[in-house]
Amino acid sequence: MNDVPKNIKDLNLEDDFLFAKVMSDNEICRRVLEQILNISIKKVESPITQKTIDLLLDGKGIRLDVYVNDDKDTVYNVEMQRTKRKDLPKRARYYQGNIDLDLITAGKPYEDLRKTYVIFICTFDFFNQGRHVYTFENICKEDNKLILGDETIKMFLNTKGTLNDVNSDIKEFLQYIETTTAEFAASANNRLIKDIQKKVEAVKDSKEMEVEYMTLLQRDRENRELGREEGLKIIKLYNKGVDKQEISSELNLDLELVEKIIRDYESI
C-alpha cells in the first residue's frame, strides 16, 4: 500500500480535503444534493465542512464531512467513504442519532426534529448488489407499504455500481468522484460535472489552499506519530501484565482506546 501523501494537484473528489472545499460552495452543494436525491431544492444555507458534534464529555464525538440545511429546514450530512468498514451501517445510525441530539435541546418537543438525510458516497459496493444507490427508510416489516414517518433517510452511493438503476447523470457523477480530471469533465454530458471541475481547478491553483492542505498533512503526520507512541506505551504495559484500567489511568487515555489497541495487537 502506498502511504505517500498526494500532491494537491493529484487529488480527486474522493479525497476529503478537495470534497469539502468543493461542497462548501452553496450552489454546487445544492445541485449535488438535487442530483443525488432527484428532488428540487430552492436554496441551501452555507454548508459547514468538518462540523464537530461532541455532546457528552465522556462520549464519542463525531466530525461530519459536510453538514447543510435547506430552505425547508431539512438537514443533509454527506460523507465521503473510501474504506470498506463493516461498521458502516452502525456509523450511519450513530451519526443520525448525534445529529438529532444536536438539533433538539432539552425540553423541546419531538416535533422539532427535522427531516434528515445521512448520505455516504462510497468508492466500493458495501452491499455487493451492483447498485449505484442504496436508500434506507424505516418501514413496517409486516406491511412494507407502511412507512414509519420518522423522516430519517440513510443513503449509500457506490462509485463501482454496475446495474442500470440510476440515470446517466448520477453514473457520470459517481465516475467523476474517482476520476476528477479536466479530460473527464470535458467529455461529460452532465453539466454539473463541468461546473464542479471549475471549482476543483480553482482550489488546486490556489496557493492559500495548497498551504492549508500541506498544514493538514503535517498535522495528520504528527497525530499518527503521537498515536504510534501511545500504542507502543500501551502494549509495553500490557505485556508487563498491567490491567487495562490501570493503563488507561496511568497514561491518561480513554479506556475504549486502550482496549481497541490491545485488541488490534492481539489479532496480529
Region locations from a protein language model:
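Upstream accessory/linker segments immediately N-terminal to the RecA-like ATPase cores of bacterial MutS
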Residues: 142, 149-180, 187
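Short, charged alpha-helical interaction segments and adjacent helix-coil junctions
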Residues: 2-9, 17, 67, 71, ...
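Accessory alpha/beta interaction modules
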Residues: 1-153, 163, 222
